[in-house]
């Protein structure tokens, strides 16, 4: 199943979000017996997730074999997961790779952070600059970037962009404190660019 997830929608039940999730909607429309259960009963059919405030196309599976096969494509990096984000400032390089560990922040447990802790999980993001925009009174310009995920860590793009000092515009967790620099955006400017697709 290919789904268009709206911003603000949580993918699966978790503390504080027991109902009204994408997983709940899948069960309502398909029935629990017609969804993959590889991820457990609280994530029926879910192949991969998107952060609550990230919108775009997602994949869900109607049976365990399909769910396993799609997740294997993600693990082996066969699925192309590209995102578009607008970040603060002008990124000097036209393209690059960010390869770090990511773990939960020791200062704020809501956040993730780049970490060299041995228990941090490897996270790899490549980026390509699409366009640079002029500066304003409140910011030193913006860069429209295409990001390609080779791993799928929580808040990965948001953490990596912040790590290189180019936080996503409108990001309430990792962004700038001055809301005027977000140009009136009330949510993070981060979208999945296209449906994950298999490339040979």
Language-model segment annotations:
Residues 44-45, 125-127:
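Small-residue-enriched segments and motifs
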Residues 18-26, 30, 64, 75, ...:
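Pseudouridine synthase
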Residues 87, 126-129, 168:
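Conserved hydrophobic positions within beta-strands
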Residues 7, 79-83, 94, 98-100, ...:
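A generic structural signal for short beta-strands and their flanking turns/coil linkers
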Residues 2, 59, 84, 99, ...:
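Beta-strand secondary-structure signal
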Residues 88, 92, 130, 148-150, ...:
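Solvent-exposed residues in well-ordered beta-strands and their adjoining turns
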Residues 115-125, 190-191, 197:
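Short coil-to-beta-strand transition motifs
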Residues 1-111, 118, 134, 138:
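RNA pseudouridine synthases
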């Amino acid at each position: 199943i290919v789904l268009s997830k709206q911003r603000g929608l949580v993918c699966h039940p978790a503390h504080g979000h027991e109902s009204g999730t994408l997983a709940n909607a899948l069960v309502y429309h398909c029935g629990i017996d017609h969804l993959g259960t590889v991820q457990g009963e609280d994530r029926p059919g879910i192949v991969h997730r998107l952060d609550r405030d990230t919108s775009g196309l997602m994949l869900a599976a109607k049976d365990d074999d399909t769910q396993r096969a799609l997740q294997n494509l993600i693990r082996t990096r066969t699925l192309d997961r590209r995102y578009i984000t607008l970040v603060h400032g002008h990124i000097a390089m036209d393209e690059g790779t960010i390869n770090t560990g990511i773990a939960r922040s020791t200062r704020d447990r809501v956040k993730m952070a780049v970490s060299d802790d041995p228990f941090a999980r490897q996270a790899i993001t490549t980026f390509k600059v699409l366009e640079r925009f002029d500066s304003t009174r409140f910011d030193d310009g913006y860069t429209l970037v295409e990001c390609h995920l080779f791993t799928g860590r929580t808040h990965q793009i948001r953490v990596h962009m912040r790590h290189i000092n180019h936080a996503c515009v409108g990001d309430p967790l990792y962004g700038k404190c001055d809301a005027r620099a977000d140009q009136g955006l009330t949510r993070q400017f981060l979208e999945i660019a296209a449906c994950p697709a298999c490339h040979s």
